[in-house]
Amino acid sequence: MLTSSPDTIVAIATAPGRGGVGVVRLSGPQALSIASSIVGERLLSPRLAHFCRFRNQDGDVLDEGLVISFPAPHSFTGEDVVELQGHGGPVILDMLVATCIEAGARQARAGEFSQRAFLNDKMDLTQAEAIADLIDAGTAASARAALHSLQGVFSAEVNQLVEALIGLRIYVEAAIDFPEEEIDFLSDGKVASDLRAVRKQCLRVLGEANQGRLVREGMTLVIAGKPNAGKSSLMNALAGFDAAIVTDIAGTTRDVLRESIQLDGMPLNLIDTAGLRDSADVVEQEGIRRAYAEMRKADRLLVMVDSRDPLDDIHNLHDLLPQSQQQLENLDLPVTVVLNKADLSGLSTGPRADGAFVISAANGEGLDALRGHLKQVAGYQGEGQSRFSARRRHITALEKALMALESGEQQLHGQAAGELLAEDLRAAQKALEEITGVFTADDLLGRIFSSFCIGK
């Protein structure tokens, strides 16, 4: 059901900065009248561009350009929407917005246009999020995945699961509410078979969603190690250009350096850090503190070791980084150990039986094996496997639904199977409906839409 907001909102819909064209968007009950007061005439033909002069409340010409109206409900937000398309100078656009506000509109909050579209059933929550993902896409693969989500591919998968659960709930709850009908859902095998099918389908969607999340977010990899282990050299080798300064002087890198690259369509967020050692230098100490802070936020830690150094146990971080024992004590993070400088030590490059990787960041030997390892541990199967984009909250919701379905299967043959199974099915449905926004807390909606652009 369409619901009209009491106020009219306005915002610049094009990117900040200078451009050939800039768009100011209005949405709400006064959108048409406010726009008419600016262009000096009634907006007669919906969805047709009209060339006009834009004037302020004193009648002074601010700019000239096109005006297009989209009366409710056939608009992006489901409300009356007007776009004023003028020249893309920031000052001109700011004056247009100020004129709209003076005429009765208010400045839109971040993501408020998309939020109104969601509340007016013009799109579900995954489609609304896909708009932001499409705008933020850093790779062709992530843009394609976001577009598929915007077109409803992810929503359709979730809705199919919900429909299957509703069918199961009807059958199970009928057996509970009408015992006189003698519906025996245990003996006929229907519920067990249907529940197993739904669980398998949910597991498949979860796998695809994980691929969609990887295409969207990628993996954050912190490169850590002692000074002069070759951390910055590895970052440069993976990036394909000199992102970091490399010298033979220990402690060259003193701050956190970031670079985003792609591994076959998967974003890899590289973080180069200061060499870990005891230092009296205040600046170096701050760099080391920041290195530990980045480790706590990373998806994976890559520990660089000079392959000429003797090692007792590559699986023991305290042996690899003895000076970091206290800081790493409670760090629960998957680790990849890389033995660098094979060109100097003479070691054969590639993966070792103990799980370490031998490389030469200087000449690139062993890097292909390391790249393949990073894709493997991330669970990335290739950009062709991501049919839609997904976020961490989607993964969490699908995991909750899967846990409820697995619990339901376990309840089938226990005492009070009907009541417990019905509760698990309700929990699974609730988790899935959080994805599309059928059941979503207001504070979650606020967090989601506040991350959008102002003009969306």
Swiss-Prot record:
Residues the entry annotates as binding Mg(2+): S232, T253
Assigned EC number: 3.6.-.-
Residues that hold K(+) according to the record: N228, T247, I249, T252
Positions contributing to GTP binding: 228-233, 247-253, 272-275, 340-343
Cofactor: binding comment: Binds 1 potassium ion per subunit.
Gene3D superfamilies to which the protein is assigned, alphabetical: P-loop containing nucleotide triphosphate hydrolases, Probable tRNA modification gtpase trme, domain 1, tRNA modification GTPase MnmE domain 2
Origin superkingdom: Bacteria
One function term, GO molecular function aspect: GTP binding
Positions bound to (6S)-5-formyl-5,6,7,8-tetrahydrofolate: R25, E83, K122, K456
Domain TrmE-type G, first and last residues per copy: 218-379
A GO biological-process term: tRNA methylation
Gene Ontology CC annotations of this record: cytosol
Subcellular location as annotated: Cytoplasm
Cofactor: K(+)
Pfam families from the UniProt entry: MMR_HSR1, MnmE_helical, TrmE_N
Assigned keywords, A-Z: Cytoplasm, GTP-binding, Hydrolase, Magnesium, Metal-binding, Nucleotide-binding, Potassium, tRNA processing
Function, in words: Exhibits a very high intrinsic GTPase hydrolysis rate. Involved in the addition of a carboxymethylaminomethyl (cmnm) group at the wobble position (U34) of certain tRNAs, forming tRNA-cmnm(5)s(2)U34.
Family annotation (PANTHER family): TRNA MODIFICATION GTPASE GTPBP3, TRNA MODIFICATION GTPASE GTPBP3, MITOCHONDRIAL
Subunit architecture: Homodimer. Heterotetramer of two MnmE and two MnmG subunits.
Family matches, as HAMAP family: GTPase_MnmE (MF_00379)
Family: Belongs to the TRAFAC class TrmE-Era-EngA-EngB-Septin-like GTPase superfamily. TrmE GTPase family.
Protein name (database record): tRNA modification GTPase MnmE
Gene expressing this chain: mnmE
